[in-house]
């Protein structure tokens, strides 16, 4: 006899069933013509029906790096002009933003950005999938990359014109570190939530 195997919990779907092959059923605006309202070097403003949203120009994507090893994670802090203050983030960078590397892949870009921003080189980079951070107003996606086998090769800090501070933070003390930065008026990147996830949902970080 084959032993009984536990049946995984299935999520409950609440609301009408959606035919994922019928895109026009999603919203009255899904079939509207997409217009380019404005385009710069790095971003494009689109309008489709009633919706206005922003996307990356020239098929530029982003790579976000989760560099976690020996119970520590690498974070970066830098001034962000749209926020008008410093922001605490995971290392990240654009993929295919330079004219001579428009066809580069996310793992290549992630390795380069990790070295430039943090000064660490990864022996292994793993693609953890594509994600969308604010799909109601931004069409940009990012590839989450796990970096392992870290070796310090320089001081990091970014390229010319960047002034990046590198933090190597214990996972065990991460919530306290983030709280301290928040009290110093440092903005917190939403992607840090994945490092805090379970504890945050359980109310341990309230």
Where are these regions (language model features)?
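Short loop segments at secondary-structure junctions
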Residues: 69-72, 79, 148-152, 171-172
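Conserved Nudix-box catalytic region and its N-terminal flanking loop in Nudix hydrolases
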Residues: 56-112, 158-160, 164
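Active-site-adjacent beta-strand/loop module that shapes the phosphate/pyrophosphate-binding cleft
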Residues: 44-47, 134-153
């Amino acid at each position: 006899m084959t032993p009984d195997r536990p049946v995984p919990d299935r999520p409950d779907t609440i609301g009408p069933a959606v035919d994922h092959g019928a895109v026009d059923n999603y919203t009255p605006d899904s079939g509207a013509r997409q217009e380019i309202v404005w385009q710069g070097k790095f971003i494009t403003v689109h309008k489709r029906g009633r919706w206005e949203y922003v996307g990356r120009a020239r098929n530029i994507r982003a790579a976000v790096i989760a560099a976690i090893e020996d119970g520590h994670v690498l974070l970066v802090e830098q001034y962000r002009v749209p926020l008008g203050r410093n922001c605490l983030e995971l290392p990240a960078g654009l993929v295919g933003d330079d004219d001579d590397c428009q066809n580069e892949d996310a793992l290549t870009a992630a390795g380069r950005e990790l070295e430039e921003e943090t000064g660490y080189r990864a022996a292994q980079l793993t693609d953890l999938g594509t994600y969308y951070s604010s799909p109601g107003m931004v069409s940009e996606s990012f590839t989450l990359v796990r970096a392992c086998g870290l070796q310090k090769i320089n001081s990091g800090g970014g390229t010319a014109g960047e002034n990046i501070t590198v933090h190597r933070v214990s996972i065990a003390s991460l919530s306290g570190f983030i709280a301290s930065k928040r009290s110093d008026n440092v903005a917190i990147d939403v992607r840090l939530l994945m490092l805090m996830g379970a504890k945050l949902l359980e109310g341990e970080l309230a």
